[in-house]
Structures are given as C-alpha cells and as structure tokens.
C-alpha cells in the first residue's frame, strides 16, 4: 500500500486538574481461544460457506479454530484472585478501561503468562516510566521497568486523562482509544493482547455509562494473523494431528491461520449484540493488523451518525479509532459485516439483534408518501472496457507489445481480452419492461452503472425489479430505511425460516421493493445537500458481474422534477473499482466465448487471473470514458462511490482543479469498499484534464480518464488579482541515498526485543542491493546560476529525501525556476495550484524551464480546514517511476496574510512522507544493481524475494529510527505529520476540531495535524500497519524540557 502524509500545527492547551483516581487490576493470562465460539457454529447463507472449512477445520497440517492466546483480564483487587466478568461480546479483547478528562488512571498489571509483555495506552498522557513500549529511547533503570514485565512480575502504569488527549470540541462525549502490549507490538497484538480504552469529556458518565446512551458496544475488525503469534509453534504441536508435516512458509497454511474476525469471532458466531428498537446505541470501533486490514464495517438495516455525518459504513484500518451513534430501528436479526468482499467470504461478519420492546417509534411513518417509482431490469450485455482500442494517454494501441495495457487487452488461446459478457441494471419506462429508457448526453458517462435513483427526505422509493438474466439476483440499497422483506439480501443462520422473496429474484421473476427516506437517514446539518449512495445485487459475485448503480439521498426540496439537483449545472457519478472478472458469475461463459483455446485455460494461473482484473471507472479504462465534459465556471457535483476488496483503496485525483468536500479543499478523494463521497467543483481553467487513481497499480492498470472544461463563451483570461510573487530555484539532482545510514537503532531495538532478525531490506546478502540506492531529488539553490545550494537549517533536517518545503499564500504567483541536473527528462508539478496549461512540459537534461503556479482562493484552505493546508509537488514525465526515483516535496498554502496577522510567532513545521519506495519501479534500478549488488550477474529482477527487498518502508526516505531533526520543546507550536505518536495526541480540523493519536493516510492524502508537546522524552513515531513496522517505517521524535518552564 502506498501511503502519503504531509504537514501539522500544534495548539497550546491548558493544564489539567485531576478529578478522580481510578484503579484497574489487569492480569495477562494464557488461554485456548475458539474463533468459532463455544456456541453452535453459525454459517451465513448469503456467503460462500465452503470457505469456513479453510479457517475452522483442523487436520494433519491445519490448526483449526482453536488457538492458544494471551489475553488481558480484569480482577477485583491487588490479590488477582477474582476475575470481573466482562460482556460476552468483547470476545478476546481486554476489559473496557474508561476515564473522564481530569481522571488519573492506575493500571496494576500482573503477568501470568509464560513470556514478557506490557501495557501501552493510546490517548492518555504518561511519562516515560509508564509508556509500556520498548525501543531505543535513551531511558535507563526505573524508566525501563515498564518496558518489559516478566512472567510472574507486576508493574504499575500511571496514566493521566489530560484535556489535550481527550475528545475535541466536535468529538462525541466519549471517543475510542486502545491499549495493547508493545514489546514487539505486531506479535503481541496477534497473540491477543489488545483492549479498548474509552476517553470521555468531563461529567459525561453516570456510573460508568455515558449519559443518554442505552447500550454501548466495542468491536474490533481484524484479520488476526496467527502466523505472527508467539504461540504459533505451540499451536501447531497441540492442534495439528501430524505437526511434523507442517510447512510454516506454505501459503495455504499461512492463509488458514488468518482469522477474519470481529472481536475474535468468525462466521457470525459473536454472541451478545442485542438491543431494543429505539435504543440509543453507541458503537466504539477500531481496526488492527496489516495491509490486508482494509475494512468497511457495514450495519445492515441501520443508519449511524459519526463526527456529525450520516454513515452506514465505517472504514477501519490498522489502529483506526472510530465512534458512531445510532437509534436502533427495524426489529429483526441484522448483519454487521465487512464489505471488503474477500473478507465477507472469509467470515468477517457478526449478527446483532434488534428486539421489539414496545418502545414508541421516533420516526415518522412515511410509507407510501411522495412515491418515486423506478422500473429496473437486470440483463446480459457484452461490455467493452475500452471501445476505442486506444490508450488516450499514450495514443498507443491497447494491445501494443510491452505496454502496461497489453496484459488486460491481449486476446488469445488463454486470454479473454477487453470484452466480457456482464450483467447490468437498466431502466425501463413501465412494468411491461418492453421500452428501455434511452440515456441522454448527461448520462453517457454512467457506462456500466445502473440508472441513478434519486430521492429526497420524506420520499418512498418503489423499485419494480425484473430479472432477465439466468441467475437469481436482487437489488440491495445502501443509505435508506428497509425492512427484512425489502433488504435485497439474505444471511440468517441455518434453520431460521425461508428467505424473503426480495432477497433473490428468480430468472424471469419480478419483485417490487419499497424503501423509505425518513429524516433520520437523510443529510445532517454538516452533510452536503445530497449524500452519494449505491445499490447492488446482494451476493459478492453479483457486483463483480456488473450489477451496481448510483443513488443519491437529498434534503427535502432540493431536487427538480427530473431528479436533478437544483442550482447545479452538471452532475457526474464515478465508480472506480477493480472489476475482478475471475469472481464474475459469467467467467466460464467468457472463457468459452472469447478465448481461442478454452480447454487450455487454467483459472488458477496467476497471470490469467491478473489479466481479468479490470482497473476501471464506470467500466472504462485508459481514458475511454465518454461524457465527462463541462463549462468553465460551471457548478459541478461529483458523486463517487466504490465497492470491492482490499485492493480497492483509491486516491481519485482531479488534475487542474480543486473541489470542496465537507468544507475541506482538496484535489484527491480517498475511496474504500462501500464508501461514497459528494464533491463540489467550479472549474476555472479551460482544457482537458485527468481524473485518475493515484494508487500506483491502479494508475498503470488503466484507472484513469479525461475530463474536458470548455470556455462556452466565457472569457479565458484569469481575472484573479495575484499581488504576491515568490520565486524558487529548484533542481533535480542525482544522489546516492542511504535509507539506513546507521544500523545502531535497529540493532538495539532487536536486542531489547530479544530477537535476532536479519533484514531483507537492508542486508545485502549475496545479490541484494542493500540500503544505498542512486536516486534523484529536488534541491533548492540560491539563484538562477544553480551554483550554490541552499543549506538546510536545523528545523529542515527532518525533510530527508523530500524536496524543499515551499510556502505560498492565497493570492500569490509562484515562479519555479527548474533546472534538470539529472540524466533523463523530469518536470515539477504541484497539486492544488492553477496553471496556464493542463500539460506539464518535461525539462530535458541540462535544460532550465520556468513553471508558474498561481494560488487563487480555490487553492487555499476551505472553511473546514486548518489555516494552512499541504499539497505535494512531483515530476509527471512518468508519474510512477519519477516518484519512486525520489522526486517529491511539500507545498504549504496558507490563507492570505495568515502567518503575518494570526501567527506572529514562528511555528515549527514538520512535513512527513510515509511511502513504500518501490525501487523496482525506479529509473535507476539497473544502475543500482550494477553499483551495489555484490553479484549483479546473478540478479533476477523478476525474483519475488529480490523485488520485495527493494520495497523500502520509509519516513522521508529513512528507516529504523534514522530520520533526524524531529526535535521540539515543551509548549512549542509545531507542524507535524504522522500516523501514531507515542506520548501525545494531536488535533485536526474536519469542520470542527477533533482529537486522536492515530491518523490514516492513503494514496494522495495530505493532512494538517496540530499538536502541542507536553511531556519531555524521546518518543516513538510509526506507521501502525504490521508489515510496515517490521520493515522499518518508524522513527523517534524528541521533546526537550522548556527552559523557561520551572520544574514542579
């Protein structure tokens, strides 16, 4: 996964007054844990249940569903004899620790396990001697005692619920945090040592319950990787009937030990999630794990509010912390599932029960009122992913030998090519289904998608569905109120009665669905006028087959009679996804129809499977999508939505223009499985621009289109007045870059963890490259002679491989005098800025060129942003290879005069780029093999282990504590970026101020975070993705005592 992050601001907070002392007696014990629960195994009918045996059945070389684990338990007192029972739905999670702002929490930890562990808290303040995490931090003696609690030993951890760690202004009363063991955090957590910590605003609890909340639940979505557990060897010996036959490196064995679970329960076996209809329910959610842990937690039949926005799906990633509120509706048995379609098949679901307790309903009965009736059929088509046969970006034939597109469009004995039989939704005029509605020019861009279903709050949506295909199908809506008969899917446990007829409509059958839009599912006061939603057929394979369409749910009175949004010139719906044709219901038909030797096709062949993964938008690839055209100055709404699996992490970049979403100014929108966004754009420059996914594999695989902005009679000149002017002299310079100049921190870390690990990324071994690579970087010079480089100051030392940190205010014109001192063509282009042309001209080696970036209002902060927002600049000659070769830097744009008027004190600014530099994609790979490999003649560039050794998990181009210069004083105002900060929380703007200590970053993401350090020490800063931690994406930052603050 390619993860970006750029820039932070700190805010000074007041001192805390301790309110209450709270004591928790926590023991670590070892136990046998059953992922299928001790209840009868529940198999889900809507899911491909053959998968359950892969994970739950033991055998000669399979462990099965029971594993030895270490877990946290709560005891009544310091004698550690009497266990306090926890709710059954917590599974193997530790007990809930709760604190209000101002409380002082004492955690008395006793280790009953057979190896050392610790207790490390997120979201509370602690001094170094109570951190519970082991890494090289210059602590000794008493300050080290907390870092490793040996078997049989005890340790006291003292934690403070400071205001700056507590809920922000716009946060809910209680927010989700976590605690876990932190000797080797990924292995400790995989072994079971993880639990919830809930930090509440002062006076928001009543006898440990949040006021005005009837029920609360904590859920962790995780692919628990038992291959990483400290107890793997023991589990093999105990539960495999022929342990000597186990090959731990076997991929199938490893997959059988990845337990797709909610709180440690798989395949719907989590007990105890029960509530009454009309109960006010608070959900605390978090994710943990690895790159595979891309979760979309979907609450069937319900709609929630999170951060004051209306949601039904919550995206969770490793160490993502969320809370959400719902009023339970619709009595019945509903599924809480991960809508990552691979995870759904593998058992990541739970049931929750909404019981009819005869409470009076809070919702208006709008059934049958303001009916909008749609007639939709599912039918077969032959779909061509690129009708022109041409790559609109390179002008090459899509089957050109050696092109990136050839793998997907080649047709032959065992290749299907670019056309597939698919199923699609299409709209008809009436219930006879004889006259299909023609799509007008404004709908041309919809492509493979079904018709737009539009509704306002107060409406009833009636959909008469006719199945013209040969498979049972349905329509399942997202974001409206449904009952069990109209849900469009079925997943109840075996033996619970026949499925409702709307859950699967037989071939040639017809069913009329009825859904309602009460105000409780409509936009909140913070939401846009229309919420982007979707509908699809209710089986995982159906979506990949093509059955998905857009829906929008709008405020009352906001739509015209034809369903278009008032006061908007254009509306576009985009569905970026990797259509996995291997999962299509029609795969066998496509093999027979399009391959010339179908009997020779091996459906398990990796190259064959890859050729069928179509990286598309609305079913179009490589710029073949029609209809994305608008006029300069138009008011444009973009509705984006996605579905799929863990590869469907999208950073959708709109070149040439910016948009507003939830008050924030951006040009790159992040999408995940079953998420949707509404974006507002007013294009201000005529030309042809790109809309593309910045996830590297998706971009090269064809997930990119063109959109056109025409003058339409408008004046083309830029009338904005640019009063400020800045000039920067930037060169592209080739350097030798060392990702790990010192191995001292890394080796000390492994010594402290008592592990003797080799490093596939940094060790050269026989033919690997090691830690040094030839790269190209942006560097600043004093003037146009490019003779004297600008020396980096102490506060810029942290930038590492990044180019200079450039600054501009709204109203500025920025002149970039760029000299290419490298050996191949490069350029420099920034996100967010306005340029005269949509084309970025390459600069040849030895040449100098001027690039002009204008900073109009639409390049600056939105009303929901921090005053200064980060953008990124890089070379676009070959966006992928240029980036991985090293060309990237930060641009900070502030509101006009912000730094002069509002911020007279100079803040520290830290820009951090979290990126897996894939050196296999560098222009200099061959040079690096020749220069740094001990045996270049033995190198096989296609060897998987060699390729993996060149994926450098770095922060600003440094690994394992090698990033220098992150130093600040207590009370400093600082600008920072990162994923998880030990010791401190930060604030971030999201149309209001929120607090966390973990921030999620995705392709093309930049975010300003604000933090005021309070606690001196050397603290860990790292990515919380398991593989990234082990691969070295971690460093430390230093908080020095403020000499002006007197001790005590």
Curated annotation (Swiss-Prot):
Cofactor list: Cu(2+)
Residues holding Na(+) 3: 761, 770, 773, 949
Domain of life of the source: Eukaryota
Tissue specificity annotation: Expressed by the liver and secreted in plasma. Also expressed in the hypothalamus, spleen and uterus. No expression in the cortex, heart, intestine or kidney.
One Pfam family per UniProt: Cu-oxidase
Annotated residues for binding of Cu(2+) 5: 650, 693, 698, 703
Residues that bear Phosphoserine: 716
Binding locations of Cu(2+) 1: 120, 980
Binding of Na(+) 1, residues: 55, 64, 67, 256
Sample GO molecular function, one term: glutathione peroxidase activity
Residues that bind Ca(2+): 128, 143, 146-147
Residues at which Na(+) 2 binds: 408, 417, 420, 611
Binding positions for Cu(2+) 4 per the UniProt entry: 295, 338, 343
Broad class of enzyme this protein falls into: oxidoreductase
Keyword vocabulary terms for this entry: Calcium, Disulfide bond, Glycoprotein, Metal-binding, Oxidoreductase, Phosphoprotein, Repeat, Secreted, Signal, Sodium
Family the UniProt entry places it in: Belongs to the multicopper oxidase family.
Subunit composition and interactions: Found in a complex with MPO and LTF; interacts directly with MPO and LTF, which allows Fe(3+) incorporation into LTF, activation of CP ferroxidase activity and protection of CP antioxidant properties by MPO.
Name of protein: Ceruloplasmin
């Amino acid at each position: 996964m390619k993860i970006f992050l750029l820039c932070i601001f700190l805010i000074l907070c007041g001192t805390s007054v301790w309110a209450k002392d709270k004591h928790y007696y926590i023991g670590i014990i070892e136990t046998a844990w059953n992922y299928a629960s001790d209840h009868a195994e529940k198999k889900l009918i809507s899911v491909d249940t053959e998968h359950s045996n892969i994970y739950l059945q033991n055998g000669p070389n399979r462990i099965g569903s029971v594993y030895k684990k270490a877990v946290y338990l709560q005891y009544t007192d310091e004698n550690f004899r009497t266990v306090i029972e926890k709710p059954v739905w917590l599974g193997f999670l530790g007990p809930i620790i709760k604190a209000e702002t101002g409380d002082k929490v004492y955690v008395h930890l006793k280790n009953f396990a057979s190896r050392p562990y610790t207790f490390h808290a997120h979201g509370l303040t602690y001094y170094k001697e109570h951190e519970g995490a082991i890494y090289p931090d210059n602590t000794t003696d008493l300050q080290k005692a907390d870092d490793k609690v040996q078997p049989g030993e005890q340790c006291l951890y003292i934690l403070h619920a400071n205001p700056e760690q507590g809920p922000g202004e716009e946060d809910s009363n209680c927010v989700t945090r976590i605690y876990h063991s932190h000797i080797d955090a990924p292995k400790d957590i995989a072994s079971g040592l993880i639990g919830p910590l809930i930090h509440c605003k002062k006076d928001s609890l009543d006898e440990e319950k949040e006021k005005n909340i009837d029920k609360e639940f904590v859920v962790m979505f995780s692919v628990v990787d038992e291959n990483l557990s400290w107890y793997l060897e023991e589990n093999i010996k105990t539960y495999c009937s022929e342990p000597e036959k186990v090959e731990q490196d076997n991929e199938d064995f490893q997959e059988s030990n990845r337990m797709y679970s909610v709180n440690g329960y798989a395949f719907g076996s989590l007990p105890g999630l029960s509530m009454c209809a009309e109960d006010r329910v608070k959900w605390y959610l978090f994710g943990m794990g690895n790159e595979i842990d891309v979760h979309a937690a979907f609450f069937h039949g319900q709609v929630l509010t999170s951060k004051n926005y209306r949601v039904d799906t919550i995206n969770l990633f490793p160490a993502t912390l969320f809370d959400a509120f719902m009023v339970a509706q619709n009595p019945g048995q509903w599924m809480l599932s991960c809508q990552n379609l691979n995870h759904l098949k593998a058992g990541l679901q739970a049931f929750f029960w909404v019981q009819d307790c005869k409470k009076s309903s809070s919702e208006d009965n709008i059934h049958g009122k303001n009916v909008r009736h749609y007639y939709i059929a599912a039918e077969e088509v032959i779909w061509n992913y690129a009708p022109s046969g041409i790559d609109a970006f390179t002008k090459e034939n899509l089957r050109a030998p050696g092109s990136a597109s050839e793998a997907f469009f080649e047709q032959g004995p065992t290749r299907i090519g670019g056309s597939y039989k698919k199923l699609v939704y299409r709209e008809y005029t009436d219930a006879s289904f004889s006259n299909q509605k023609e799509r007008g020019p404004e709908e041309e861009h919809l492509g493979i998608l079904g018709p737009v279903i539009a509704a306002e709050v107060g409406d009833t949506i009636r959909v008469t569905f006719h199945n013209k295909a040969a498979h049972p199908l349905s329509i399942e809506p997202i974001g409206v109120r449904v009952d069990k008969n109209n849900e469009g899917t079925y997943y109840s446990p075996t033996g619970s009665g026949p499925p409702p007829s709307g859950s699967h409509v037989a071939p040639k059958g017809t069913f009329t669905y009825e859904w309602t839009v009460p105000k409780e599912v409509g936009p909140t006061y913070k939401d846009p006028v229309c919420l982007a939603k979707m509908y699809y057929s209710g089986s995982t394979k159906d979506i990949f087959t093509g059955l998905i369409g857009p829906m929008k749910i709008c405020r009352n009175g906001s739509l015209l009679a034809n369903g278009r949004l008032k006061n908007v010139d254009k509306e576009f719906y985009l569905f970026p996804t990797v259509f996995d044709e291997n999962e299509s219901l029609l795969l066998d038909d496509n093999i027979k129809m399009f391959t010339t030797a179908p009997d020779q096709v091996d459906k398990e062949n990796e190259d064959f499977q890859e050729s069928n993964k179509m990286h598309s938008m609305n079913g179009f690839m490589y710029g073949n999508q029609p209809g994305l055209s608008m006029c300069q100055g138009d008011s444009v709404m973009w509705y984006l939505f996605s579905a799929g699996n863990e590869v469907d992490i999208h950073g959708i970049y709109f070149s040439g223009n910016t948009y507003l979403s939830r008050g924030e100014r951006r040009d790159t929108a992040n999408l995940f499985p079953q998420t949707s966004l509404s974006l507002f754009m007013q294009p201000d420059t005529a030309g042809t621009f790109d809309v593309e996914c910045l996830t590297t594999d998706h971009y090269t695989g064809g997930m990119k289109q063109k959109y056109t902005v025409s003058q339409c009679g408008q004046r083309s000149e830029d009338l904005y007045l640019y009063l400020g002017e800045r000039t920067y002299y930037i060169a592209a310079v080739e350097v030798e870059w060392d990702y790990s100049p010192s191995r001292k921190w890394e080796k000390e870390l492994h010594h402290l963890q008592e592990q003797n690990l080799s490093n596939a990324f940094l060790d050269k071994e026989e033919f690997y490259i090691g830690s040094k690579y030839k790269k190209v970087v942006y560097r600043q010079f004093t003037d146009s002679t490019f003779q004297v480089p600008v020396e980096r100051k102490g506060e810029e030392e942290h930038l590492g491989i990044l180019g200079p940190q450039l600054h501009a205010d709204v109203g500025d014109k920025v002149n970039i005098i760029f000299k290419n001192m490298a050996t191949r063509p490069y350029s420099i282009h920034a996100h967010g800025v306005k340029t005269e042309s949509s084309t970025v001209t390459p600069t040849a080696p030895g040449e100098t060129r001027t690039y002009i970036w204008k900073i109009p209002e639409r390049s600056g902060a939105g009303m929901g942003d921090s005053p200064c927002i980060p953008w990124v600049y890089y070379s676009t000659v070959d966006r992928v290879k240029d980036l991985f070769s090293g060309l990237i830097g930060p641009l900070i744009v502030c509101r006009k005069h912000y730094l002069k008027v509002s911020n007279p004190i100079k803040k520290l600014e830290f820009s951090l780029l979290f990126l897996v530099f894939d050196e296999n994609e560098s222009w200099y790979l061959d040079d690096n093999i020749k220069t740094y490999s001990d045996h270049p003649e033995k190198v096989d560039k296609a060897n998987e282990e060699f390729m993996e050794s060149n994926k450098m998990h770095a922060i600003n181009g440094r690994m394992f504590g090698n990033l220098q210069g992150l130093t600040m004083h207590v009370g400093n105002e600082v600008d920072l970026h990162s994923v998880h900060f030990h010791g401190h929380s930060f604030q971030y703007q999201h149309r209001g101020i929120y607090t966390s200590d973990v921030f999620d970053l995705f392709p093309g993401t930049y975010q300003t975070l604000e933090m005021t350090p309070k606690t001196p020490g050397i603290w860990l800063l790292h990515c919380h993705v398991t593989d990234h931690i082990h691969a070295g994406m971690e460093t430390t930052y230093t908080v020095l005592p403020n000499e002006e603050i007197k001790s005590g």
